[in-house]
Amino acid sequence: MAAGFRTNVWDPVLIISQIIAIQCTFYISLGVWVLIVDYWSGSIHSLDQFFAYKELDISSLKGKLLMIAFCLNSLTGAMALWFIVKRAKQCLDFTTTAHIVHLVFCCIYAGFPFSWTWWLLNIICLALMAVIGEFVCMKTELKAIKVSAGSSGKNSV
């Protein structure tokens, strides 16, 4: 195989570690945003806010603030993609994986989410995280690469 620019090498350890890092960042940042929402709304802290679809109630202030926390978490997740994955081509893959793992955790914790609000919110958050992550990664990938012209001066042969 000829050497080329950014050759792809199958590295399952790297991929799994990136998935774990993105998932941890996803839940840590969601925890921070939910903590801020709880402070504003005066709610008690609960895992239900992460995993129970019934908490995402559009008619209550608490539910609306929780939805905002999920959307803000998408922005934080996009920055995590930029920092951890660094490839625009892989942002959708890692974002989808994070949200599918979140769906599995929600199903284990509170059962299958039958609320259209939960599905709509998670699809919007997935799209936000993927698109913004791809944008910031692409801006980094498209930066000019500085190439030195070589040595000049007295020590040249």
Swiss-Prot record:
Superkingdom classification of source? Eukaryota
State the compartments where it is located: Golgi apparatus membrane
Q: What is this protein called?
A: Protein SYS1 homolog
**What exactly does this protein do?**
Involved in protein trafficking.
> Which organism encodes this protein?
Nematostella vectensis (Starlet sea anemone)
Please classify the protein's predominant subcellular localization into one broad category.
Golgi
* Membrane topology classification: Multi-pass membrane protein
Quote the InterPro entries the UniProt record gives: Integral_membrane_SYS1 (IPR016973), Integral_membrane_SYS1-rel (IPR019185)
Q: Which Pfam families match?
A: SYS1
| GO BP, sorted A to Z | Golgi to endosome transport; Golgi to plasma membrane protein transport; protein localization to Golgi apparatus
Spell out the PANTHER family in the cross-references. PROTEIN SYS1 HOMOLOG (PTHR12952:SF0), SYS1 (PTHR12952)
Instruction: List the keywords (alphabetical).
Output: Golgi apparatus, Membrane, Protein transport, Transmembrane, Transmembrane helix, Transport
What does the sequence similarity comment in the record state about its family? Belongs to the SYS1 family.
Segments traversing the membrane: 19-39, 65-85, 91-111, 112-132
Output the Gene Ontology cellular-component terms.
cytosol; Golgi membrane; trans-Golgi network
